[in-house]
Each structure stands twice: as structure tokens, then as C-alpha cells.
Amino acid sequence: MALQVMFGLEFFLVLEALLFLFTCYQVVKAGRILDEIQDKLSEVKRGERVGTKRKYGTQNKYTGLSKGLEPEEKLRLGRNTWREIRRKRGKREKKKDQLAEVSRKRSLCSSLDGLGKPALSSSEAGEESSSEETDWEEEAAHYQPANWSRKKPKAAGEGQFADWPQGSRLQGPPYAESPPCVVRQQCAERCAERQCAERQCADSFIPREEQRKIQQAFPVFEGAEGGRVHAPVEYLQIKEIAESVRKYGTNANFTLVQLDRLAGMALTPADWQTVVKAALPSMGKYMEWRALWHEAAQAQARANAAALTPEQRDWTFDLLTGQGAYSADQTNYHWGAYAQISSTAIRPGRRSRAGETTGQLTKIIQGPQESFSDFVARMTEAAERIFGESEQAAPLIEQLIYEQATKECRAVHSPKKEQRLTRLAQGLSRAWGKPRLLKTDNGPAYTSQKFQQFCRQMDVTHLTGLPYNPQGQGIVERAHRTLKAYLIKQKRGTFEETVPRAPRVSVSLALFTLNFLNIDAHGHTAAERHVQSQIGPMRWLNGKMSLIINGMARILS
């Protein structure tokens, strides 16, 4: 068994050796055939192949010896020296740099206007000296056939159909080069203008339609000679407003400050509509702003109608909104009218947010994870939308903040509760005036020592109703109900909307209406019935004319 294994190994080794020898024989044979073919080739054809390889293939590094001619002739011409090699290499690099610069300028010009191929300037063309051209032609002559010559462009009438008679349909055109296409050149100019416009708008997030609207906004300025001129709104300012609206919302402080800055400029009603339409994210928001703007303009127009100056009486609703006769010319307004237009335009931005319950302050409660400062800011903002920026409502806001805060915040501020109640009472006194008399029920809130001390300090008489007698309290409640009803009626009128009044003035006007303008069936007002005595009919008593006054007879003399 061992002998068989050894015999098999020897057989495989001998077989591999034979295969190796056969492969070597084939390689040597192929090399001999290649040498024979190369020997048969002539020296001229070999030079042509080398020239073609150098012309169309990759250029190899120069070895220092020239092929095709004898070394003695090359040395005589000075083409094998290292100085000549470095000079030629520098020329090639310079030529490459020139071609790269020309191609770069050509691509730049074609991308901007596309009006044709640019021609090289005289300075660029002069860089090619006559000696360099001669060297290139001599170098190329070694690799080109003897019968080769440069083809010259044919002049007019020297084409392949030049021998045909004039008028023949095979006769060539009477010019050597094609004429320029005027239509194609005009199309290229329009394309170049469109590309420039697209490049100018490429770095903006605002669509092109909105940019056209922005370009129509022009505030009014007065020139040096007194004439009215328009100046465009800065693009960066409108862009900042649009970004602030998209990122933070229309009620953010940053957005409101930017609107206040824009309101300092004299913008026409059309300008405000254009700017707001470009800044708001949707047409629904714009329509909501436009409705609120018209509402504010109507209130301002009613206030202008009751103004003292005749100029302000002419500032109507159409003037403030740019409608009717003022739709065409909006640059010759009075400067005060532009201030009212700006104030009415930015007023809708300070209104309550959609879906937020700002009408009821009692529903604004501090959240469990909300900071106390954020809660105070929300309450203050909602109160300002209802009461305005008034110091009279500050005690009420403080009391609501204390009652609707979390337990932890109330525990911190609890020692100051008595001071807040005192400030609340003082605030009510400033708002409504110091009362002379207070009539309340017998509740513990009104019978406490703190309340009695407050009444003594304010010099107010405090009366309580009879215990277990709801009729006396009902009279007071009915009087309050009647007074409240008249206050609501006056608020619905036009005078209350246009001229905002203090609470004291509103109550005084309601009391004046109740006491002096309501007449009973006998033609007497409530004030007359209160101050006058009850006068009865006249009668004859003891032969004399007497008048019954308060149940007693008085003789008329």
C-alpha cells in the first residue's frame, strides 16, 4: 500500500514538470515571433506608431534621447540637452494653463448670457510667440507623413458644387460661415435674464408670488422740496417679520416689537395689506386680520367724527382703510392719519389667540409644572386685553393671582394677604371714588374687625340690614340690578365704543340717566320726586284757598 502511494506522488510530480516545460516553450516561441514581426516593420512605420501613441495616448516621461534621428544630428540641433528639455516642459505647462484659463472664461460667459463664443483678447493671443509656434511645428513634423499639409478653409464659391451653374439647387450658399441666428440670440438673452432672476431669489424662503407682493409695499416720505415720495420697505425687515410669525406666532413679543418698529413708518392702507399678506402663513389668517382691522378702523372713525379738530373729522372709515375715493391716491393723507392707520393695523396682533379663554380670568389657573412667573405673565396679558393698561385693575389681578396659584405659591405669599386686601380696597376706592355710606348684610366678612377698621380709616359709614329680613336686602339688590342694566345699555352704544371712559364716569352717566332722564306719568323725574314734597290738590278751608302739602293744609295768601 505504501509503495502505491509513493508511485502516485512521483507520477504527479513528473506530470507537473512536463506542463511547466511546455508552458515555457510556448512563451519563448511567442517572443521569437514578436521579434520577427518587429524586425520586418520599417523604421518609418515604427515612427508613425510612436507618433500616434504620443498624440492620442498618455505621454510618457521624456528619457533624454530622441527617436527617429541619429544622436549626432540631435546634439547638433540642441534637442538632447537638459536645458532644452526643461524649456519644452515649461512651455507645455504654460500652454496647459492658458487653455484652462480660456475654457474657464468660456464656460463662465456661456452660463451668464449664452450669446456666443468669446474671442481671445489681443494680450492673450500675443503670448504665443513665433518661436514657440515654430518649435511646435518642427516637433510635429517628425511624426507626420511627408505629403501631409494643413487644410485651409474654403472661400466662398470653392465648395464641391462650385462648378455647377448659378441657380442650381445643388449650388452651395454664397458664404463660407453660417450667419448668426437673431431669434436664437434673443431667446438666449431672455433665458439669461430668467437665470439671473432665479439666482437672486434662490437664497430666500419666500415664494416668488409673495416677493412680488413685498415689492409693492412703499412707505410714504416727504422730499426736500415738500413733495410726497415712496421708498420701499427693507427686505430684511419683512423677512424678519415673516420668520418671527412662522417660528414664534403673531402674539409673540418679538413679533409685536417688530410691528411697532414698522408702525413708526408712514405706510398706506394698501402697504399694510401687502406686508401682512406676505408675512402671515395662510390666507385664512389674513382674512381674520383684515376683519379685525376693519373693526378697529370703524371704531377709530367714530372717534374721529366726535373730534374737536375739523381735520380729524375728515378721517373716515374709507380713508383709514383705503377704499372708495381713497383707493387710488393714498400718499397725500395728513401725517396724523398715517399714525391712526398704523395703530389700527397692528391692533389685531394684540388680540386674544384663537381658542384661548381670555374672556374669563377665573379660568386661568397655574399648572402643576408651570413656573409662577409664566403664570403671572399669562394672567397679566389676559387682564390687559380686558381692562387695558390700567393701574386700577392691578389689585384685582393680584388677588386673582393669589387665589388661582398653586398651594406652594400661596403658602409663600400668604403673609402678605392682608396687605393685598387693603390695596384691593384702596384700588376700588380710586376706581369708583370713596363712598359715603356702605350698606351690607350681616355676613362675617362685613362684621370683622379688619373691615370695621378699614371703614373708620376711610371715613365711611357702614350700615347693616335687619337680620332675617331679606326684603331690605332685596331693595338694594334690585337697585344694583337696575344700575347694571343701564350700564350694559350704555356700553352697546356708539359713544362708549369710541370714547373709553373710567368706571366712575360710566356710573355717573348711568345715575344721571336714571335720576334726570326717566319721566313718570305725571311728568316728574326721580330727582324731582325725591327733593320735592308731595303736593296735593287745592281746597277751600274756612273760606280760604288752601293747599294740601304732606297731609297738612297751608293757606295761600
Curated annotation (Swiss-Prot):
Domain Integrase catalytic: residue ranges: 344-534
Claim: rRNA-binding is one of the keywords in the record: no
Query: Looking at the keywords, is Zinc-finger present?
Result: no
Molecular function GO labels: IgE binding; nucleic acid binding
Any one of the GO BP annotations? viral process
SUPFAM superfamilies on file: Retrovirus capsid dimerization domain-like, Retrovirus capsid protein, N-terminal core domain, Ribonuclease H-like
Q: Which domain of life is it from?
A: Eukaryota
Q: Which InterPro entries match?
A: Gag_p24_C (IPR045345), Integrase_cat-core (IPR001584), Primate_lentivir_Gag_pol-like (IPR050195), Retrov_capsid_N (IPR008919), RNaseH-like_sf (IPR012337), RNaseH_sf (IPR036397)
Q: Where is the composition biased (Acidic residues)?
A: 125-138
What keywords are annotated for this sequence in UniProt?
Hybridoma, IgE-binding protein
Pfam families, from UniProt?
Gag_p24, Gag_p24_C, rve
Q: Which portions of the sequence form the region Disordered?
A: 113-172
Additional information: This hybridoma was generated by fusion of rat lymphocytes with cells of the AKR mouse thyoma BW5147. This sequence binds only rat IgE.
Enumerate the PANTHER family for this protein.
ENDOGENOUS RETROVIRUS GROUP K MEMBER 24 GAG POLYPROTEIN-RELATED, IGE-BINDING PROTEIN
Which protein are we looking at? Answer: IgE-binding protein
Q: Which organism is it from?
A: Mus musculus
Gene name, per UniProt, is Iap
